[in-house]
């Protein structure tokens, strides 16, 4: 009955075409049957492909100029593409935010009436709900006050992080600062392991609340950031400067927040959204989140494409839907470094998602320690906790990548990936398992990918000119 009422409302507005139009997502129709308003995302026909191709085909004197040109071109593209709709919305009381990184427009608390009107614009090709795509359960593991030892945690020893950093400092006289961004629940900026490596200005953005300083009401983001750049034996590369965007408000992540964070990564602003400075963009971005992957799941593809053009290395957790084959999550399943999780004994963690992807692509790309990993807790400045998940494995991938970029900051994505693959350790606990027609004793495979990360071996492959 409620769906019939919804259609009647549209008809009374004179919008029969909108009712029948495939522009309006079926899920959005169902949402309006339950609630009178909802946040929506509008997709425009122009898209970003032409801009990305143009920027990719041109040469720029340096990365900063590339990023500025990319962000400017995408912004102008969205203004031209969306001008009629933006002008229309300006005559209403609805709040909107342009997503130039994907040529989309977010509208807050949209109504049935508004959707019917928006669907009539010929340049609009799709209108869908700004869904909550991923949820975090709040960490419940015990809180530890202080660390029992200043020595590196077992997971850092596994990936030979300290040895790699020592080698890096022995062979490099002018090591550049590497900026690493997390898109997560935030970070406790005052934590003893993290306060010294925070980038500071241009290091934080909260799309929802526009909070001034990094914060974390969940703990997931603090933990993963600690594994990347934490001091005191918990971080893979503590010399990195961390940045963070709050793509997940407390226990959930919306499409808008994640896309908006992806846009901020390309050209960071101050926390209030002002004074963009593309030169502050991170060199890599760590994403410890994943959603179910179907052929229709493409909503983050354009963000990843833009990152590649802007020379931002994307690292993703592969998902926690194992142990069955074909369970890899999105976006770790596309053209990114997708990281699975291993245990203290170098077996695959039972929760770690396994490939192949639904398109037959080999995934995960690599694996890293992800079970029983100790890192910073959000509950106190000297508190820690142990967590498990591919969320914990992903920041190892980011940390190792940061070490490699510190050796050669201008490396391409493909060369970074080649170094990770070349150095990966294949002396792992296999079981003869077959996924996608590949047994796990043959590398690469769909269980371990190319192997478990080894920062030292990967760095040595670069220094020795093996790749």
Question: Could you say what each language-model-derived stretch is?
Answer:
Residues 225, 243-248, 370-443:
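Hydrolase catalytic cores
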Residues 74, 89-93, 119-122, 128-131, ...:
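Sec/Tat-exported extracytoplasmic proteins
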